[in-house]
């Protein structure tokens, strides 16, 4: 690859780093966990952060166990 190509690649990577939202960089690792309904059957609405969608998504939660990527409200998930 030519030096011009390398400089272009470096510039694009730098731009991508700058434009990546700070909130997604600072999210704890449990936000990478998938939505987990859990083994119980007390079905209720809950929210989890989707790294693929870069937003909080509603899902049906069974009411027990599951994992740490589980929030009662959209507001809790987004903070």
UniProtKB/Swiss-Prot annotation:
Disulfide bonds join 40-64, 56-77. Its main location: secreted. Gene3D superfamilies: Pancreatic trypsin inhibitor Kunitz domain. Residues 31-79 form the BPTI/Kunitz inhibitor domain. One of its GO terms (molecular function) is serine-type endopeptidase inhibitor activity. Expressed by the venom gland. It is found in: Secreted. Keywords: Disulfide bond, Protease inhibitor, Secreted, Serine protease inhibitor, Signal. SMART domains: KU. InterPro entries: Kunitz_BPTI, Kunitz_BPTI_sf, Prtase_inh_Kunz-CS, TFPI/VKTCI-like. The keyword Glycosyltransferase does not apply. GO terms for cellular component: extracellular region. Residues 1-24 form the signal peptide. The keyword Nuclease does not apply. Pfam families: Kunitz_BPTI (PF00014). Belongs to the venom Kunitz-type family. Serine protease inhibitor. This is Kunitz-type serine protease inhibitor microlepidin-5. It comes from Oxyuranus microlepidotus (Inland taipan). The lineage of its organism: Eukaryota, Metazoa, Chordata, Craniata, Vertebrata.
